[in-house]
């Protein structure tokens, strides 16, 4: 992997890094900033799709694997949780329509699409302010957590 010593020349998004290195998302090899193991191809796509930033340590570009993203997202939630608000309240607080707000998933840090934001609104679920940014749950994490709760409930019933 090439090293970027000049901060002005560093690409901070994974597709831009691929363009700079003249490679593709399929062929890029990049390590996790937390555990230092190379990302699998599915994790590379997830990182690019999540629109997260590439970070640099000693000029070397690093990303984050899915297990580390979920682990550190939970730590971030536990350390920096501030409050929870409904979608209409969030629009009033920010004076911005829900559609125009950048809201990430609190579990996997993927930006929520308009349908996922609307799902929060219709099912009266709250958005949570964590580390100064509002978060919700994407479709995948919403259903995964729901399945986990259902399994736990069955295990505890006698």
Curated annotation (Swiss-Prot):
Q: Name one Pfam family in it.
A: E6
Look up the record and report any one GO term of the cellular component aspect: host cell nucleus
Localization terms from the record: Host cytoplasm; Host nucleus
Q: Which GO terms describe its molecular function?
A: DNA binding; PDZ domain binding; zinc ion binding
Lineage top rank: taxon: Viruses
Endpoints of the signal sequence: none
Gene3D superfamilies from the xrefs? E6 early regulatory protein
Give residue numbers for sequence motif PDZ-binding domain: 156-158
Q: Which UniProt keywords apply?
A: Activator, DNA-binding, Early protein, Host cytoplasm, Host nucleus, Host-virus interaction, Inhibition of host innate immune response by virus, Inhibition of host IRF3 by virus, Inhibition of host RLR pathway by virus, Metal-binding, Modulation of host cell apoptosis by virus, Oncogene, Transcription, Transcription regulation, Viral immunoevasion, Zinc, Zinc-finger
Which parts of this protein are zinc fingers (unnamed)? 32-68, 105-141
> What are the GO BP annotations of this UniProt entry?
DNA-templated transcription; regulation of DNA-templated transcription; symbiont-mediated perturbation of host apoptosis; symbiont-mediated perturbation of host ubiquitin-like protein modification; symbiont-mediated suppression of host cytoplasmic pattern recognition receptor signaling pathway via inhibition of IRF3 activity; symbiont-mediated suppression of host type I interferon-mediated signaling pathway
Major place of localization? host cell
Q: What else is known?
A: Belongs to the high risk human alphapapillomavirus family. The cancer-causing human papillomavirus E6 protein has a unique carboxy terminal PDZ domain containing substrate.
Cite the record's note on assembly. Forms homodimers. Interacts with ubiquitin-protein ligase UBE3A/E6-AP and thus forms a complex with human TP53. Interacts with human NFX1 and MAGI3. Interacts with human IRF3; this interaction inhibits the establishment of antiviral state. Interacts with human TYK2; this interaction inhibits JAK-STAT activation by interferon alpha. Interacts with host DLG1; this interaction leads to the proteasomal degradation of DLG1.
**What family name appears in the similarity comment?**
Belongs to the papillomaviridae E6 protein family.
Q: What does this protein do?
A: This protein may be involved in the oncogenic potential of this virus (cervical neoplasia-associated virus). Plays a major role in the induction and maintenance of cellular transformation. Acts mainly as an oncoprotein by stimulating the destruction of many host cell key regulatory proteins. E6 associates with host UBE3A/E6-AP ubiquitin-protein ligase, and inactivates tumor suppressors TP53 and TP73 by targeting them to the 26S proteasome for degradation. In turn, DNA damage and chromosomal instabilities increase and lead to cell proliferation and cancer development.
HAMAP family, per database record: HPV_E6
**Protein's name in the database:** Protein E6
Species of origin: Human papillomavirus 39
């Amino acid at each position: 992997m090439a090293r970027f010593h000049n901060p002005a020349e560093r690409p901070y998004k994974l597709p831009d890094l691929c363009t700079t290195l003249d490679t593709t998302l399929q062929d890029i090899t990049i390590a996790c900033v937390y555990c230092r193991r190379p990302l699998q191809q599915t994790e590379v796509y997830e990182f690019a799709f999540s629109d997260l930033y590439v970070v640099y340590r000693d000029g070397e570009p690093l990303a984050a694997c899915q297990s580390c993203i979920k682990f550190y997202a939970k730590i971030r939630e536990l350390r920096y949780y501030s409050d929870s608000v409904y979608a209409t309240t969030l629009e009033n607080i920010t004076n911005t329509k829900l559609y125009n707000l950048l809201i990430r998933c609190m579990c996997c840090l993927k930006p929520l699409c308009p349908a996922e934001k609307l799902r929060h609104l219709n099912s009266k679920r709250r958005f949570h302010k964590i580390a100064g940014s509002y978060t919700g749950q994407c479709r995948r994490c919403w259903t995964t957590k729901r399945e986990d709760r259902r399994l736990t409930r069955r295990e505890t019933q006698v």
